[in-house]
Amino acid sequence: IMGYLGNGYMQTYNQYGEPTLFIGTGKDGGGYMRAYNGNGDESAYVGTGRMGGGYIRTYNNSQKETSYLGTGSDHAGQLRIYNKEGETSSYLGEGYYQAYNQFGERTLFLGTGTSGGGYLRTYNFNGQETIYLGTGADSSGQMRVYDAAGETGTFLGSGYFRTYNQFGKMTTYLGNGKDGGGYLRTNNKFETETSFLG
């Protein structure tokens, strides 16, 4: 086991001459540390980024990045988890969480909207939105279920429920009327009323 102390850095080696640790100062003046596995491949990095924020990166034995914890380009904290191929599988950022499938398509979003309300979105394997559950523009709760084409199939809002056909036409309404009473309305595929109960 060997070590080397240089001008502004320290490096250690294993009995086979492979590097195991490097601690030093980068070109930008920030400090950093690199750890290596027994084969001399980098397994972890702790240090200062180009924009002055700190971060930690880990790597698998194929030199693919597996995690990132630190400051992002928006100067906020973030955590990224990667699959064994180095593709993003999870992201936790400033007020939200995202998950990705093996093809790199987003499958889940959980977070805070621009209006300050929370919501959850799910996506199919092609990245097409399938469900929205959260706060609507009027600050009430709502749920939308989308069909394969991305059109709203079902909508559940504050005091009402609606269904839609593949053409985006409303086929059913169950809920409250303007007078405060409840009613049920069904429509044909052209959204022409076929029955009314209320």
Where are these regions (language model features)?
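Parallel beta-helix/beta-solenoid repeats that form elongated, surface-exposed shafts/blades used
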Residues: 1-198
